[in-house]
Amino acid sequence: MQKLFILSVATENTEEFKRFERSLNIQEIEYKILGMNTKWQGGNMEMGPGGGQKINMLRSELMTWNKERLNKYTILFTDSYDVITLTNFTEILTKYNNLCDNDTVLFSAEKNCWPLKQLDIFYPETDSEYKFLNSGGFIGNAEKILNLLEKKIDNSEDDQLYYTKIFLFDNKIDNSINKIKLDYKCDIFQTLNGAFDDIDIVNKKRIFNKYTNTFPCLLHGNGPREIKEYFNKLSESIIKYYSKF
């Protein structure tokens, strides 16, 4: 049986990171943080493209795993400072297995085409408003994720563009199986940029997407300052709810 293991990158032990880690501990999910107390060389991602260092850290970690471990684990890679986990590993794994086979990595989806708006014409048609790849969260077999990371990237280059190019232009295994699928209905990943009106809080601890009629498993406050402020307020209220028990 596959086991879920969360990997994330954080170089500083900030209050935002502690909130993310608290959410993982609440849900009792096994995890490892990459890069703590090392120098961040991935650019200022609040101001523009960057984040290639996350890919390099992830690749370096997975290359230390033996074949048996790579096959055994389903990896969920996520951002940390602007993310919280909302449910347990069983729900996450069940949803992933219902959406994908073991050859495919499921990426978070968002409403904005970033960082190159001009790539929107290459995206496949879908009924969902969440049609663009977001690299802040993805889940798949550890070996399949490592296979996605073959191409080199500089630390300061953009991680979202790296994965977007694979999805748009190099997404087939043996001309039949997709390497990457997008979480069009936010079954697992909920991005917030442009999605204020889509979500409600249910029972003070879960997010419900009214547009997709789903209960996402992770909440990601991607986007500009007003998004971060909304995410901070929302995530703090959810963490506070769990702190009562």
Model regions and ranges:
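Short, aromatic/basic amphipathic alpha-helical patches
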Residues: 17-27, 120-122, 230-236
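Conserved donor-nucleotide/metal-binding helix-loop-beta segment in metal-dependent transferases, i.e.
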Residues: 83-125
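Catalytic core and acceptor-binding pocket of nucleotide-sugar-dependent glycosyltransferases
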Residues: 130-244
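Generic preference for well-ordered alpha-helical elements
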Residues: 14-17, 52-55, 82, 86-90, ...
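N-terminal anchoring/stem segment of glycosyltransferases
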Residues: 1-74
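Juxtamembrane luminal stem/stalk of type II transmembrane Golgi/ER carbohydrate-processing enzymes
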Residues: 1-8, 14-16, 91, 227-245
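A generic structural motif
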Residues: 31-40, 106-111, 179-190, 245
